[in-house]
Amino acid sequence: MPKPKEYVLKKSEEIEGTKVEGPWLDDTKSLEEVVSLYTQIGFQATHLGKAIEIWRKIEEKREKGEEIRVFLGYTSNIVSSGLREIIAWLVKHRKVDVIVTTAGGVEEDFIKALKPFILGDWIVNDAELRKKGINRIGNIFVPNDRYIEFEKYMIPFFERILEIEREKGRPLTASEFIYELGRFMDEKLGKEKEKSIIYWAYRNEIPIFCPAITDGSIGDMLYFFKEERRDRELIIDIANDIVKLNNLAVTAKETASIILGGSLPKHAIINANLFRGGSDYAIYITTAVPWDGSLSGAPPSEGVSWGKIRAKADYVEIWADATLVFPILVWMVMKR
């Protein structure tokens, strides 16, 4: 005879742990106090709370003089958004040591120092936008004159790179190319360059790696430059950057991998850390899912299986739009 009550009201064991509880707003006086209680809320708030704790631990150790080399990776859409300025602040204040991004993460940073991107909408007539020469990145609009202006700067910059390569007798690596682009910004652009990632990376000698440097408008400009001039001299060396990036991981006492999004920057960083037995700390912020087997969706624990993150590493993954959580994360760590 079934005993419904025993099934429904099954006895449970007592468990120890953190009580799930949110902030009581009568007792909180600031948003900072609210966020400080995120670890107890549950779901992704708890993951954000843990990310704050991990990065604070990293910062506290660095402030004491301990060596933790911080690798920051992000995709181009991060720079398309207003997160660009937050990353530029981190670079200005030397809160990161190594950057890996995509071509868009380089060129859009430069373009924004010329003209801004404009807030639009998600639901629009894209065919009409095309007629008007307006490109769309989600709800961000990029008029095509931004790229026309970009070309005006890139052609003389390519000429400069050619001269440097002739003087050195070898191609520049992508990271050297980006360093020279920062120098070029310093010489040619005005006050707006002071919110640029590339500019501050140049000033503080923080390397920016971009293994897919031609996969964007820079590649378009290189195509026009080479075709119109029948140039075969200008070459960007990717191979030697692999040595430099990997050695930055190998020679570090400890490393931290902070990844916004997925794609190439994520793998370039964690694969470099494989050469030292894995990263000691990792913070992933992503909306990618793990069940399609993609690298973008692979959680930190999967990286442990490859040796790219250490088994005893302190890590967390936040499943959220980075534009929502990264500003909170940085503020809570750097402005506490």
From Swiss-Prot:
PANTHER family: DEOXYHYPUSINE SYNTHASE (PTHR11703:SF0). Catalyzes the NAD-dependent oxidative cleavage of spermidine and the subsequent transfer of the butylamine moiety of spermidine to the epsilon-amino group of a specific lysine residue of the eIF-5A precursor protein to form the intermediate deoxyhypusine residue. HAMAP family: DHS. InterPro entries: Deoxyhypus_synthase_arc, Deoxyhypusine_synthase, Deoxyhypusine_synthase_sf, DHS-like_NAD/FAD-binding_dom. It comes from Pyrococcus furiosus (strain ATCC 43587 / DSM 3638 / JCM 8422 / Vc1). Signal peptide: none annotated. Pfam families: DS. The gene is dys. Belongs to the deoxyhypusine synthase family. Its EC number is 2.5.1.46. It catalyses: [eIF5A protein]-L-lysine + spermidine = [eIF5A protein]-deoxyhypusine + propane-1,3-diamine. Keywords: Hypusine biosynthesis, NAD, Transferase. This is Probable deoxyhypusine synthase.
